[in-house]
């Protein structure tokens, strides 16, 4: 939705153009139909409510943490352990209010369950992991903050990315190809919830965007 420095070319602009007044207005005129959010430059699924009754029902499911969300991401290095559960408090970064951080005292509880699907080991290139993340909560920047907490970051993440990743000269071409990622390598792949009017479980799955798929294909080809 429109935010600081980004008032055009948003999902809300497209929704208003296509559906005009056929959207819920529980969040006011600036966010019609928007029940939840995903980070800017993250691809994948969002659920949109066309009326206030559905919006209220879906909002409660998000509040109860009963909606199932699964993300795929590419991260630098290897997360230890390979599979696990991250449970912390997350609050706004005091030094940079646009970022979030893990907090020992203040903040909202955030839980991410993760599973390493594959580790790519390519000569002269830092290891890269394909990771599946399932959210029990949906805090702002949650996956990215939790990965930083574990000592890593997403490929293409300009806000939380690691600054000390070293590439040898021979792999400048590889680095340039990674730079073609359209944002961080994070994709909201599946979303499942109880339909607000049909009262049955519905599940949706989104294909990987082309830039993510090309990067994954590149890693698979180089790692053998």
Please state what every model-predicted region is.
Residues 1-85, 89-94, 211-220:
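RNA pseudouridine synthases
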Residues 15, 47, 73, 114, ...:
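Residue-level signal for inorganic ion chemistry
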Residues 40-41, 67, 108, 139, ...:
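Short flexible coil/turn linkers enriched for glycine and charged/polar residues
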Residues 71, 84, 88, 110-112, ...:
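Short beta-strand segments
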Residues 97-105:
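Short aromatic-glycine motifs in intrinsically disordered, low-complexity regions
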Residues 105-109, 115-118, 122-126, 146-224:
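Pseudouridine synthases involved in rRNA/tRNA modification
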Residues 131-134:
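Short histidine-centered loop motifs in beta-beta connectors
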Residues 139-147:
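Short beta-strand segments enriched for Tyr within beta-sheet-rich domains
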